[in-house]
Amino acid sequence: MPPRKRIGDIMLEHGFITEDQLQLALVEQKKTGELLGSVLFGLGFISQKNLFKVLSATQQDDRSAPAKEDSGLDVPEEIDYLVQQSSAIFQKTTDLHKAELDSPHSPLVNLVEKILINGIRRGATDVHINPDMKGVRIRYRVDGVLHHGMFLPGKLLNPIVSRIKVMGRMNIAETRLPQDGSAEFFYKNRGLDLRISSFPVIGGENIVIRILDKSQVLVGLESLGFLEEDIESIAESLALPYGMILVTGPTGSGKTTSLYSFLSMINSVNRNMFTIEDPVEYHLPLARQAQVNVKAGLTFATGLRSILRQDPDVILVGEMRDSETAELAVRAALTGHLVFSTLHTNDAVSSIVRLTDIGIDPFLVSSTIDTIVAQRLARILCVHCKEPLPADNPAYQAAAADPAVHTLYRSIGCRACDNSGFKGRTVIYEILKVNRRIRELINKRASIDDILQAAIDNGFHGMNVIGMKKVLLGITTLEEVRSLARSAN
């Protein structure tokens, strides 16, 4: 069977682009990981019409031929199919508004499904559908970083948005106001929850879809990246009959995953466990889980009040968003319950001050909080392409690493990691254990610096220490840890 023609070659043969334009596009493609056709279209080197001609030609080739890793010209099979689908739909745009927005046989439904499946395959947590001056830009957030997916013709924006709104049970006629919706999506016998947000911007409506896989298996703390000695410290806190354990960090830092891993360590038939969340991200056996429904009047505060009448042993409050919820959670911890929750603070010590700043009595804070874990997620170097740094690289001196003992690495990029150089993430964290001295300082409304010094005297170290350990182990890069340390400070 003859080798499949590459898209770049076909474009050159037809005179649609020049060799110089192709080389420029390949350089850009290596930076972004984008489809070659999308790069050429985005740079203005090829028109939509000519791009679709090339895609039609590639469709006639053998689709089973594998792409060569070093060519830089072949399009991955599932992406190629998605682009060809968009081409077919674009040719039928006059019929798009006549098509049923929820018909399984509609080409529009098929296109939206392919966009979602592509994100799921890439391990995306979010799918972004953005109006762009040149068309519709599809992007995927993978390992915390947005990656280009593809460009679609601008005429497809409104039909795609309408289809997604139908899925999310949103008002397709309302385009002037932001809306939120949710949908269930099945892929390979897995039920996924989609959280949909629309926002009107210049050029149309911007759509972001959060992908939640409730069926994913909870992993242990070691798999998340916690070190053995710190797992033992956390286990000691989990053995307490009452008190409060907090996990803090920005959105997307893995707080919920860590909390559920904590809960799974103590989940048993002998404990009555409740959660109130927005949304419920994991299913936990034996736990009674509730989801916030503001429209129906079920908030974190009202849910927590009712849970306290259900004879709970362990309570997870997804987030302490306001003073009412925070005070209820703190009082629950004071009255014989083990309470878990999250806060949006940059570091562990700041969480203490945040609670007192929103009006919680320092005595209640000092009497209930036992452990605070602040965390970030660092990208893991791709094992297939990471490259050792030479011994004279300045990174060794910056990391205080001896090249004879440790090997530092840099990211390169390959097909296995979608040319990003990273695959997966590991937790970078700090653990604050609230001892007697820190409790005294909380009661005195001491400053963050005073509490931090007391914590250091008790063996506390910042998350940069854990980060540097993982650099020396070859798990991540010095640049990645430095970036996270800056955000923590």
Per-region residue spans from a language model:
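Short, flexible helix-loop junctions that flank or precede catalytic/ligand sites
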Residues: 18, 96-118, 122-489
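Non-catalytic accessory regions
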Residues: 1-91, 477
